């Protein structure tokens, strides 16, 4: 994997920023469906509703495929980093080490009743892995909502996106 991709995947802020930008098509789907009616210069044939819906669906699926590939590559990078950490470290990973809160900053029990509990420290790759799992769940929610907008604008044209996306 190239270092640029690795840097994007291992930095949570960059990772979320890439996904935010890649989700623009989903965020603007209603605008895409509506504006297609008004963008044609005079004399040019307007596309039919079916053509417009198919074009939006095509762009949507291209974006989804691109995000799927990016997330899979990031998962591979994180897994390899976790494996590398496990192989190079003879001691357990940070997540397996439990640190008593007395070694950290003291917090009033009134402010945080769990301050005296044992805290778990995650390594950076483990944090990224958790974020990736969360982003995969977010993807499903976004796709459900986007597909609902598309099927409302294009009634009777499409099945469930999970069936259609596989085709």
Curated annotation (Swiss-Prot):
Q: What's any one GO cellular component for it?
A: mitochondrion
Q: Which family does it belong to?
A: Belongs to the MIX23 family.
InterPro entries linked to this entry: MIX23 (IPR019171)
From the Swiss-Prot or TrEMBL record, give the protein name.
Protein MIX23
Q: Where is the composition biased (Low complexity)?
A: 89-106
Under Pfam families, the record lists:
MIX23 (PF09774)
Give the source's domain of life in one word: Eukaryota
Q: From its record, what is one biological process in GO terms?
A: protein import into mitochondrial matrix
Annotated stretches, region: Disordered: 81-108
């Amino acid at each position: 994997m190239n270092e640029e991709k690795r840097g994007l995947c291992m930095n949570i802020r960059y990772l979320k920023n890439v996904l935010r930008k890649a989700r623009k098509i989903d965020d603007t789907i209603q605008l895409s469906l509506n504006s297609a009616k008004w963008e044609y210069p005079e004399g040019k044939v307007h596309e039919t509703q079916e053509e417009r819906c198919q074009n939006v669906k095509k762009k949507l699926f291209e974006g989804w495929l691109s995000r799927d590939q990016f997330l899979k590559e990031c998962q591979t990078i994180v897994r390899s980093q976790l494996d590398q950490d496990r192989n190079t470290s003879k001691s357990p990973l940070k997540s397996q080490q439990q640190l008593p809160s007395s070694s950290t900053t003291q917090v009033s029990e009134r402010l945080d009743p769990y301050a005296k509990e044992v805290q778990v420290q995650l390594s950076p790759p483990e944090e990224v892995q958790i974020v990736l799992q969360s982003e995969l769940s977010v993807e499903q929610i976004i796709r459900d909502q986007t597909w609902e907008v598309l099927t409302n604008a294009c009634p009777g044209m499409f099945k469930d996106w999970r069936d259609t996306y596989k085709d």
